[in-house]
Amino acid sequence: MKVLFVTTEMDDFVRVGGLAAVSAALPRALRPWSDVRIMLPGYRDVVEQFTHIEIVGQCAALAEMPACTLGRASTKDGLPVYVLLCPELYDRPGNPYGDESGRDWPDNDIRFGRFASAAAELAAGTLDKNWAADLVHANDWQAALTPAYLAWRQLRIPSILTIHNLAYQGLFPKDSLRRIGAPDSSFHIDGLEFYDKLSFLKGGLVYASHLTTVSATYAKEITTAELGCGLEGLLRVRSAAHQLTGILNGIDESWDPRHCAQLAQPFGAGDWKGKQANADYVRRQFGLAVSRGPIFGLVARLVHQKGVDLVLSAADEIIRDGGQIVVTGSGEPAIEDALVAAHRRVLDRGLAAAGHDDLSAVPDDFVGGRQHEVDALLMHEPRD
């Protein structure tokens, strides 16, 4: 089976949240049974990391979406990656979705409408004349319109949409419908319309052949009024039709601390000297005082939904009792500012921010204040 895995993040190239980890691990896990290929936007960080990108096709302009070029490359271990090359949309500073101050790019409808439209063309075999997909696997709102473009063009290619986080829906003004070349008939309650706005995610929920999410628990939670983010009615319909499945994320063995070259000292279960050596290294790297107390890790996108504010409210008590906290990630400017202020307040005694460094092997425990299950990755990362 030929599978096109459509994503806007992938570890080793560009990362904002857990989507990047899934996008790096799942296609590799599928390789023994399928010809799986990844499609990514041509962000600056992505393009710079490939030594060679072969041009395979051209996308014509559509509505307000510019023409673009499709390139093909491969990872170091031979996984094929298609890159959508359009510098005016993707060659920008900041992160994939916003500028350096954390504000969303105002043309994100164009940026990800262009991406989804091109993915549908690639799946149909009109961009790479030597390859077409038997199945399209789109991820989150940024790629969610891929099944919609397939349907609008009457392309009978089965599609899956995975919901990694229902709270992020890709909402835009109604006028975006025209900007991305979507048919007027799609703007209604059984289409892309969501409280008089256009919802990219809803488009995928409506048009994808099947929906999946990160666990069986989360699949149930998003059909409730409390956690359905206004989409619970549609999700209940898809669930009743057996078209919504929760699949628990599995363990990525590349995180095994016994064989990880990135650690200061590899270690396994019961090897507390090795564990301590890595903890001491992290303390030195981030200016924390030497201690034999526990390190608590917070590995998350720094947004309210992840409970970062609750961790901050407990930080003084944790530090007073001898613990230390290491935070990794980026996110809302207000929360980042609060972390900086907390760090200045306690100086080296117990709180450090570490950007996007992977520190899952170091903490003695993890903290977070999520009130519902939306992170099914961290709990499975092997750390001994």
Q: What annotation goes with each model-predicted range?
A:
Residues 347, 362-363:
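A short, highly charged, low-complexity intrinsically disordered segment
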Residues 1-355:
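Catalytic cores of nucleotide-sugar-dependent glycosyltransferases that transfer UDP/GDP/TDP-activated
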Residues 357-359, 365-366, 372-376, 381-382:
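Alpha-helix boundary/capping motif
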Residues 350-352, 371, 384:
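Generic low-complexity, intrinsically disordered segments
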